[in-house]
Regions:
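Active-site loop segments of alpha/beta catalytic cores
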Residues: 3-167
Length: 167
């Protein structure tokens, strides 16, 4: 039940101090949610166990996740979120099939969110080519890892960036 999240957004928007401020809603990206579902633990060591043993299951789960994530986006926007961030903690684990597991699922969410009139921030953590990601997925803004050179990236994309600093 995610209704406490939506109620919090409503309450924040009603707050006198925040009534004219943007509120960033948050969703996990399909790939990251899939990693947690199948791996059952955080892949902190960079390993995903038995992940591609059933491609049909993975594809079905991605479709289901797309539907549920869009509902979560819609409910956050309806409650008053003015920006949505798609956080993909484990996108750096994708070694091939970027279209299938990273670009297309994220693009679906970005297009849906933009159709609601809301800008989208993406953070595909750990990927090697932020320029390519931005060209395909077209987020309103992108968060970058601390090891990405922001000046270099800005030569290749035309959207705001955030991050690029070592924690």
């Amino acid at each position: 039940n995610l209704s406490p999240i939506y109620q919090l957004i409503v309450d924040l928007k009603k707050s006198e101090d925040l009534e004219n401020k943007d509120i960033i809603g948050f969703v996990g990206a399909p790939w990251t949610l899939l990693v947690y579902m199948i791996n059952k633990v955080s892949p902190k060591n960079g390993l995903i166990k038995n992940f591609f043993s059933d491609i049909s299951l993975i594809n079905n789960l991605l479709k289901i996740l797309d539907k549920f994530i869009k509902t979560h986006i819609k409910n956050q926007v309806k409650a008053g979120a003015t920006i949505i961030q798609i956080f993909d903690s484990w996108s750096g684990l994708i070694k091939s099939d970027f279209d299938k597991y990273l670009y297309n699922p994220t693009l679906s969410l970005v297009n849906y969110t933009k159709s609601l009139g809301v800008p989208v921030i993406c953070f595909p953590r750990g990927i090697t080519d932020y320029s390519q990601f931005c060209k395909i997925v077209e987020p309103s803004m992108v968060n970058i890892d601390y090891d990405v050179d922001p000046k270099n990236l800005l030569k290749n994309i035309d959207i705001p960036i955030q991050g690029g600093l070592h924690p």
